[in-house]
Design a protein with these regions (language model features):
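Non-catalytic cap/lid and distal C-terminal segments of serine-dependent acyl enzymes
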Residues: 1-177
Length: 177
């Protein structure tokens, strides 16, 4: 990370950047496997705030960001745990619920089953629009995180990103694309 814009920005703006290893977990508690959602959204923030008194636990100072699977994961974490994160930077972050699942015994299918199971994940906590709808229905819109979402025009998952974009532009005022 040395000699990167991240290090320069951290030094210039005086904030802590924590980059946990979450493999290809999408920051979720896996159907079969590790509990990355609990780690990223609960354990890690608690550990950081307990170990480093200079890092505030006030949600307004706690952001989550990610790219691709991590982009989905950071949106998932912030929408499911709105009292933890106030802002999201989601890059190339489509909703995994919008990805067609074919159980063809491929590595991709096996990984999807490990993460989410073999059922449709719409209307579950794995679906970003479901989590956002739940946040609004539970009258917690004031806790909704500010979302910055970006995706390059040549990204192979651009269509999935546009589905997420269109949903948030239609339903929420805390979203920027």
């Amino acid at each position: 990370l040395y000699h990167t814009s991240l290090v320069d920005t951290v030094n210039e703006r005086h904030f802590a950047a924590v980059l946990p290893e979450v493999f290809e977990s999408c920051f979720v508690n896996m159907n079969i496997g590790d509990r990355y959602e609990s780690f990223v959204a609960k354990e890690l923030p608690s550990t950081i705030h307990n170990m480093f008194a200079c890092i505030s636990d006030d949600r307004k100072y706690n952001y989550v960001s990610g790219f691709s699977n991590g982009g989905y994961g950071c949106l998932h974490s912030a929408l499911k745990y709105p009292s933890t994160f106030s802002k999201v930077g989601a890059f190339s972050a489509g909703d995994k619920a919008d990805s067609v699942f074919v159980n063809d015994n491929s590595t991709k299918a096996k990984n999807r089953i490990l993460l989410f199971g073999d059922k449709d994940i719409h209307n579950t906590d794995y679906c970003l629009t479901y989590l956002a709808d739940k946040l609004i229905a539970d009258n917690k819109k004031a806790l909704a995180p500010d979302i910055y979402h970006a995706c390059g025009s040549l990204d192979p998952w651009l269509d999935m990103n546009h589905i997420v974009r269109d949903y948030f532009l239609e339903h929420n005022d805390f979203y920027n694309y």
